[in-house]
Each structure stands twice: as C-alpha cells, then as structure tokens.
C-alpha cells in the first residue's frame, strides 16, 4: 500500500531510518535488539539477579518500565514542577522478584533516573536509542491488548463495545513516534480524536492562542495518521472533512464514530510487530548472538525462531492455569490479540481459546498481592508454524476494498474465509442521521453492503514450516466456516482502566 504517502517500511519507522534496503533495515533493527539485550544484561548484574530470576517476565516488565520512565521527559518535567508527596521525581523503580529459601520474595528497588539513562545509553553505543524504547512500549501495548478488553473506554467516547477489534495500541503513550502510530488501530485513533474534540467543546481556549495552534497541528496530524489507515477513497475523503473542520464539534464526533463502524467491514491497514520482552533479548545477546550482524525483522520468521529457543518464566497465582498464562504471553509476543483464533491456533499448534475462558489474570502482580502462595512456571511460547505479519487488514483486492473480517483485525498474512453476519453490522448504520448525510456516507454504506462474505482474505497466503526460512512453500490451512474465532466477543475480560 504505497498510497500512504510515505513509502517507508515499518522497520524503517522502527529505526527512524532514511530509505534503506532490506539488508540495512535488518541490520538496524538487529542493532536496536542488541541494545535492549545489552541493557537488560547490565540491569540483571546491577540487581544481582540469578539466571532464573533474570528470565522472569515480571522482572523484565519492571526493568522495561524503569527505563521508559527514566526517558519520559514530559512526565519528568511535570513531576519536578508539581512535586507530590512521596514521589521523588528523580528516581524510578518497581518490584523485583527473587527466590529466597524456596519462596518468591518481592523487593522494591529504587534507582536514579540519571543512572538508568546512563546504563541504557552505554548499552546503545552512547545513543538515546529511541527506537529501542518504542519497541518496549509496543511490547507493553501488545500485552495490554491481550490482557484487557477496553469496553469502558469505548463506551465513554460514545463508541460501541463491539468495536474492540479496532482498539490495538490503545494504551500506547503519545510519545511512541511513527512506529507507535503504525500499530494503532482505527478505533484507537478515533478515540484519541474524540477525546480531543470533547476537550475543545468543554474548554473555550483549547484551540486558541499559541497553545491552541500547537493543538491544531497535533489534531491535523492525528487526522492524517487515521486517514492513512483507511483504504477506500470515500473513507479518506471523510477524514479530510473532519481534518479541515474550522471548529471541530459533535458533527465531527459523529463522522468519526461512523468511520470507526465502517472499519469493521472496510478494514483499515494496521501494522503488526512481534515485540518480545527484554528478558528474551538479554540471554540471546549473552549467549553471543549478534543481532546486528545476523539481521533481524519484526514481521518475519525471526521472532518465531527466537521464541523457539528461549526460556521465559512467570509467577503464577494459586488458582491460575500456567497453560493459559502461556497463551496470554504467546499472543502478546506475536501481536495476535485481534487475530482469528482459528488462525492463531493453527500457527501455534495448540488450541487458542477466548479471553473469557482463560483462568489467568494479567502478568503484572499488584503490590498488595500475597507472595507466600506464589509459584512460578515456564511459559510455553513456541509455535508449530510461522507466518508473515500483515498490515493490510485482510483486504486483498486493493482496487476496491473487499471486506475484512468483522470481529478481527488480522495479524498473520494467511488465507481465511469471512464467515461474517453482515446484517448485524449493517443494522448499526440504519437511522443514524446525526452528523452529516453525505455522498461519502452513502458510498461507504454501499461498499459495505456489496462486500461479499464468500470472498477469502489473503488469497493463497499461508503458514510456513519453521525450517522454511525463505517462505518458499506456503501451507494454506482450511478453516471451519461456521464461526469466526474472536478472542474478545461475548466476553468479560478485565478492564484496562480498572
């Protein structure tokens, strides 16, 4: 899809690169991974973690969060200007778990942010290495997407819980740059824009003065990012209308919600990247693997191969199922929270079940949870096959957007049928005459009505054996037509905002 204006691949966005060829991209992504790995090794040394403790995903999350917090300039500045009781703006830390006398103990550590920044830069040849920071943000975002269903956030902005498959990246920080924007779903962008418009409605000065000018530039930039995710001319034209509005208000909110609904059938293009926890990269670097020299890609076989050979552990609460915890993390590592469960199951080689049937809570452990009963177990993150990550939304005939899957935002470029009940979705569009009635709306509705369920997405694309590194022999799985496997639908997963 070159029509996004910028013809940079996702690896280039990931590494802020100029135009690079494939080898250079693989090297620069590898360099980023090396840096994360070296940083992680150094932090494990500082914290005196054993090999097992260093491979504990909860410790990995704490260490990742510390470095992200150390580089969060806006928040650091805010904390210094608004000192709050008991928070030292110059320090960062979190829970580190250690094995003492055959029991898990929680230890709260605190470090100077300056010191963490020094260790990070040292691991990254003196650079700030923003790409590596963004990579960790996307890993946290993918984990959140897999763990929580954001119904409440959707309802608050006037959207419908059925739009949860559009919410990829909804917890990514604003500062996540081009790589972050690439992985945000249509619903996430719509939600950010609606929040902004609502502030403008409630606060007269939001669009005014010097600050208002910056706000306006941010608004238009977000509109352009969202426009670039749509694949049909009518959807894009509507985005132009929203962007050019003199004084964005309820009409724009209505248009945006209409566009979000339309994206359930006319899928947007959203990137998927396999971002792994730092405790996977650390041991790989420690074992002497040179990611920069070997090259690495976030959208090919590399993450699968890395996970095949990694040992990662997790703390397990008394009534949690370790296999279910493994599924949660497997999905996060492969950015598969919104993928069809039939496709995920085939690739993983074991059945992937919906969120509501998983006996597991999130990966993070709250500070008030009792450690006495905590066990730990190995996470099973291996796969039977591998597949290429997609960003097309499943619409293979780009000339006229064919239908994508309704409750799904595809992750893998694998052929699948579209067993969707279009009537339920189309019902959402009747009698919604608020906002504007325009030719564009009529055109979008017409396209959705003519979208054919019989068409398959990703025609001829398949999965590959792990020995097939060059993706030479695609295996096209055949799926049971009867039901589309949505991870969240009809489900009561925990809320992210709790």
Curated annotation (Swiss-Prot):
One Pfam family in the UniProt entry: Flu_NP
Keyword terms: Capsid protein, Helical capsid protein, Host nucleus, Host-virus interaction, Ribonucleoprotein, RNA-binding, Viral nucleoprotein, Viral penetration into host nucleus, Virion, Virus entry into host cell
Predominant location: virion
Keyword RNA-binding among record annotations: yes
GO cellular component, one term: host cell
Amino acid composition bias (Basic and acidic residues), ranges on this chain: 8-21
Post-translational note: Late in virus-infected cells, may be cleaved from a 56-kDa protein to a 53-kDa protein by a cellular caspase. This cleavage might be a marker for the onset of apoptosis in infected cells or have a specific function in virus host interaction.
Region feature (Disordered): 1-21
Transmembrane regions: none
Motif (Unconventional nuclear localization signal): 1-18
Single annotated GO MF: structural molecule activity
Residue interval(s) of motif Bipartite nuclear localization signal: 198-216
GO term, biological process aspect, one: symbiont entry into host cell
Cellular location(s): Virion; Host nucleus
Assembly description: Homomultimerizes to form the nucleocapsid. May bind host exportin-1/XPO1. Binds to viral genomic RNA. Protein-RNA contacts are mediated by a combination of electrostatic interactions between positively charged residues and the phosphate backbone and planar interactions between aromatic side chains and bases.
Family as reported in the entry's similarity comment: Belongs to the influenza viruses nucleoprotein family.
Function according to Swiss-Prot or TrEMBL: Encapsidates the negative strand viral RNA, protecting it from nucleases. The encapsidated genomic RNA is termed the ribonucleoprotein (RNP) and serves as template for transcription and replication. The RNP needs to be localized in the host nucleus to start an infectious cycle, but is too large to diffuse through the nuclear pore complex. NP comprises at least 2 nuclear localization signals that are responsible for the active RNP import into the nucleus through cellular importin alpha/beta pathway.
Protein name, entry field: Nucleoprotein
Organism: Influenza A virus (strain A/Malaysia:Malaya/302/1954 H1N1)
